[in-house]
């Protein structure tokens, strides 16, 4: 059914963006049964899986077999379902090299495929690295690109972490649940659009 929907939208000139979550999952998943400990980031000599996402065990996207899985999964979705692009949940936890490989994989099939995501850091002390591996945080994205689009440098897009943080600081809220509350939060007189975002 999803394939049919995607095809119909494509026939009418509308591309679907699929939300994907590769950064975390339960450590009781099939991956951990295949190769215990390999697919997850750990601390304390492999005894504790990390949970920087706050949503489950962090996936070791820097490991070759996980990178391969992500690229194969995106390739299948792009070839079979014809998705126009992908929005990556907590992309800042995904290895930069894995995002680069993902970009190349999908743009080899369709150079117009869009990749973007949440490239923010998990806290103020996060330096965008995990044990020597650069992650796909906002300031590392300019190091990636694809030559697939007739020599055009394809890029991975990101939601602006600085803007997001400024909104949270300015409004005093970590989450604004409605348009009404957003307009109230921004009607205090200070213009958030003149605040530094980077």
Describe every region a protein language model picked out:
Residues 1-81, 101-110, 114, 119, ...:
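Substrate-binding/active-site clefts of carbohydrate-active enzymes
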Residues 85-91:
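Short catalytic-loop micro-motif centered on adjacent basic/acidic residues
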Residues 91-97, 122:
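Acidic-and-aromatic substrate-binding clefts and catalytic sites of carbohydrate-active enzymes
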Residues 103-198:
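Conserved alpha/beta catalytic core and glycan-binding cleft of carbohydrate-active enzymes
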């Amino acid at each position: 059914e999803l394939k049919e929907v995607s095809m119909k939208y494509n026939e009418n000139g509308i591309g679907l963006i699929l939300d994907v979550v590769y950064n975390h999952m339960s450590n009781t998943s099939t991956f951990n049964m295949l190769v215990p400990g390999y697919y997850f980031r750990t601390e304390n000599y492999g005894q504790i899986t990390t949970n920087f996402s706050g949503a489950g065990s962090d996936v070791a996207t820097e490991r070759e077999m996980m990178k391969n899985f992500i690229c194969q999964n995106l390739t299948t979705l792009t070839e079979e379902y014809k998705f126009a692009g992908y929005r990556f949940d907590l992309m800042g936890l995904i290895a930069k090299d894995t995002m680069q490989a993902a970009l190349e994989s999908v743009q080899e099939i369709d150079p117009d495929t869009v990749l973007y995501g949440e490239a923010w850091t998990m806290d103020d002390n996060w330096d965008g690295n995990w044990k020597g591996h650069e992650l796909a945080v906002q300031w590392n994205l300019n190091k990636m690109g694809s030559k697939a689009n007739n020599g055009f440098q394809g890029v991975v897009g990101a939601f602006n972490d600085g803007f997001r943080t400024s909104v949270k600081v300015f409004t005093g809220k970590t989450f604004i649940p409605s348009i009404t509350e957003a307009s109230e939060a921004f009607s205090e007189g200070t213009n958030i659009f003149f605040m530094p975002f980077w």
